[in-house]
């Protein structure tokens, strides 16, 4: 019996190491931010084209904390963005665009993705937001 007593604390320690989504892993989420300019009528004026220096946000996990942004990055010259060093888990990526119908005049365009293993690279493709000229 004494021989196996050391296994109890080890078992408790290992079972409590369930890491949640967030920084600290080797997974990555990447994509490209594009904008299209839209008239009041809903017709597209210009675009979509790459959007430079615009904030792209990430929410770690299921957003149970009210979906506040956990981190953000600025889009690069070709609209590209990336969130490196993530753990396995669920993430929501979003950017804020303009809207004629929302009372605030702004709307979030989002996509929810899952990194399936600790080294996965998830490309969400193009995230397209509207801008009012």
Question: Where does each model-flagged region fall?
Answer:
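Sec-dependent signal peptide recognition
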Residues: 2-7
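A short tyrosine-centered beta-strand micro-motif
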Residues: 89-93
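A short, amphipathic beta-strand motif
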Residues: 27-36, 42
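Short, surface-exposed beta-strand/beta-hairpin micro-motifs centered on an aromatic residue
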Residues: 74-85
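C-terminal motif of bacterial Sec signal peptides marking the signal peptidase cleavage site
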Residues: 13-16
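Short amphipathic beta-strand segments in non-cytosolic proteins
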Residues: 47-72
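Structured interaction patches on ligand/partner-binding surfaces of diverse proteins
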Residues: 98-125
């Amino acid at each position: 019996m004494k021989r196996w007593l050391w296994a109890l604390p080890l078992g408790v320690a290992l079972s409590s190491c369930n890491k949640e989504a967030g920084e600290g892993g080797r997974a990555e989420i990447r994509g490209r931010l594009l904008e299209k300019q839209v008239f009041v009528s809903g017709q597209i004026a210009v675009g979509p084209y790459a959007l430079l220096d615009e904030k792209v946000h990430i929410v770690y996990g299921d957003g149970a904390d009210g979906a506040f942004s956990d981190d953000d990055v600025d889009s690069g010259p070709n609209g590209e963005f990336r969130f490196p060093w993530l753990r396995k888990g669920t993430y929501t990526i979003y950017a804020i665009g303009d809207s004629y119908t929302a009372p605030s005049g702004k709307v979030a365009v989002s996509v929810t993705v899952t990194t399936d293993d600790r080294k996965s690279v998830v490309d969400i493709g193009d995230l397209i937001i509207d801008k009012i000229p």
